[in-house]
């Protein structure tokens, strides 16, 4: 979870709140397009998270987030192949200042264009873990295995080795065998 201030927690619990969204689209070529609440089609944005692709529990499933948004931006949709979208939520606190919370980085999977609107659908980097395991036998700590998987999938590991080792079984040796998959 992202750490927020006590003032943020109080503001989010209020009956009414003033907030806005901003974001940045970065193309594979490094071109950046900034957008704010004026560029977002009202009521078009969403972020949802789902664990499994169906109604059954699956071993190894992770929560993956989907983001959708419609923007009044004049961007060629074909330039958005392999682009990333960063979203930020700005909440007004009791003292009148705004606290910013990053809502994630999403990889564009669909970009559709109408005359005035660009519609984006994107997924977070957890989908990078949806790949075949190479089947070798391995023994290691939880952190070692997490670091191995994160590096192989190109995803930054959010926890430090010390944080993982502080967990109840964080320093235990674990085994993975090919026939488990």
PLM region descriptions:
Residues 1-137:
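Assembly/oligomerization scaffold segments
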Residues 112-181:
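Charged- and aromatic-enriched interaction segments used to assemble
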């Amino acid at each position: 979870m992202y750490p927020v201030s006590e003032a943020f927690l109080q503001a989010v619990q209020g009956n009414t709140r003033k907030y806005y969204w901003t974001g940045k689209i970065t193309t594979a070529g490094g071109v950046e397009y900034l957008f704010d609440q004026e560029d977002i089609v009202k009521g078009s944005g969403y972020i949802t998270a789902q664990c499994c692709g169906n109604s059954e529990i699956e071993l190894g499933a992770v929560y993956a987030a989907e983001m959708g948004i419609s923007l009044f931006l004049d961007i060629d949709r074909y330039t958005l192949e392999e682009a990333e979208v960063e979203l930020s939520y700005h909440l007004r606190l009791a003292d009148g200042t705004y606290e910013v919370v990053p809502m994630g980085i999403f990889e564009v999977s669909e970009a559709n264009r109408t005359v005035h609107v660009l519609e984006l659908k994107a997924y977070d980097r957890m989908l990078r873990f949806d790949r075949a395991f190479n089947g070798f036998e391995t023994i290691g700590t939880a952190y070692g295995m997490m670091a191995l998987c994160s590096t192989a999938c190109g995803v930054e590991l959010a926890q430090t080795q010390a944080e993982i080792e502080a967990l109840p079984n964080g320093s235990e040796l674990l085994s993975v065998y090919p026939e488990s998959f």
